[in-house]
């Protein structure tokens, strides 16, 4: 089946791969023949909530590769990124960026940076936010805080 785009990009920390990450990656592979995945460096995540609980880059990389292999995704490149723009201005032939509603602003910044260099802006493919059983968005921050699991289920605390 012909894909809409030849080369697409998606990026993130991908800490404790959850349903939201998986939906984002699935959409990227659904629309793109080749998927470039920007994986944030350890240095870039220092300002994130509960950053001390974020898994190291190498562990996040292995978890990401495992997900890609289990789902038989083959046409991808994972590249370490050190800022929000990453390699999106270096690969001129990129055609689209896949983001969630929450990270749409990042896609706008990427396009601004590309346009400043005379590059074609990327089409922006947006997926909806995936909600937990509590009704809030599934996020790595909530998982790191011990409030939900990667499937969006609340974590029950033992009463004392």
From Swiss-Prot:
<keyword id="KW-0548">Nucleotidyltransferase</keyword>
<dbReference type="GO" id="GO:0015937">
    <property type="term" value="P:coenzyme A biosynthetic process"/>
</dbReference>
<comment type="function">
    <text>Reversibly transfers an adenylyl group from ATP to 4'-phosphopantetheine, yielding dephospho-CoA (dPCoA) and pyrophosphate.</text>
</comment>
<comment type="similarity">
    <text>Belongs to the eukaryotic CoaD family.</text>
</comment>
<dbReference type="Pfam" id="PF01467">
    <property type="entry name" value="CTP_transf_like"/>
</dbReference>
<comment type="pathway">
    <text>Cofactor biosynthesis; coenzyme A biosynthesis.</text>
</comment>
<keyword id="KW-0808">Transferase</keyword>
<protein>
    <recommendedName>
        <fullName>Phosphopantetheine adenylyltransferase</fullName>
        <ecNumber>2.7.7.3</ecNumber>
    </recommendedName>
</protein>
<keyword id="KW-0963">Cytoplasm</keyword>
<dbReference type="InterPro" id="IPR004821">
    <property type="entry name" value="Cyt_trans-like"/>
</dbReference>
<dbReference type="GO" id="GO:0004140">
    <property type="term" value="F:dephospho-CoA kinase activity"/>
</dbReference>
<dbReference type="InterPro" id="IPR014729">
    <property type="entry name" value="Rossmann-like_a/b/a_fold"/>
</dbReference>
<keyword id="KW-0173">Coenzyme A biosynthesis</keyword>
<dbReference type="GO" id="GO:0004595">
    <property type="term" value="F:pantetheine-phosphate adenylyltransferase activity"/>
</dbReference>
<keyword id="KW-0067">ATP-binding</keyword>
<dbReference type="InterPro" id="IPR023540">
    <property type="entry name" value="PPAT_arch"/>
</dbReference>
<dbReference type="GO" id="GO:0005524">
    <property type="term" value="F:ATP binding"/>
</dbReference>
<keyword id="KW-0547">Nucleotide-binding</keyword>
<dbReference type="GO" id="GO:0005737">
    <property type="term" value="C:cytoplasm"/>
</dbReference>
<dbReference type="InterPro" id="IPR054937">
    <property type="entry name" value="CoaD_Thcocales"/>
</dbReference>
């Amino acid at each position: 089946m012909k894909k809409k785009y030849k080369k697409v990009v998606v990026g993130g920390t991908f800490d404790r791969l959850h349903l939201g990450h998986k939906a984002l990656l699935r959409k990227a592979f659904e629309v793109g023949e080749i998927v470039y995945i920007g994986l944030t460096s350890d240095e870039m995540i220092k300002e994130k909530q509960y950053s001390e609980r974020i898994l190291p880059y190498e562990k996040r990389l292995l978890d990401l590769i495992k997900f890609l292999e289990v789902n038989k995704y083959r046409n991808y490149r994972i590249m370490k990124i050190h800022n929000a723009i990453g390699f999106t201005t270096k690969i001129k032939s990129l055609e689209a960026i896949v983001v969630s509603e929450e990270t749409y602003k990042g896609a706008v910044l990427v396009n601004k940076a590309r346009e400043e260099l005379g590059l074609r802006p990327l089409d922006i493919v947006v997926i909806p936010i995936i909600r937990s059983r509590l009704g809030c968005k599934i996020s790595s921050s909530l998982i790191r805080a011990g409030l939900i699991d990667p499937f969006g289920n609340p974590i029950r605390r033992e009463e004392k």
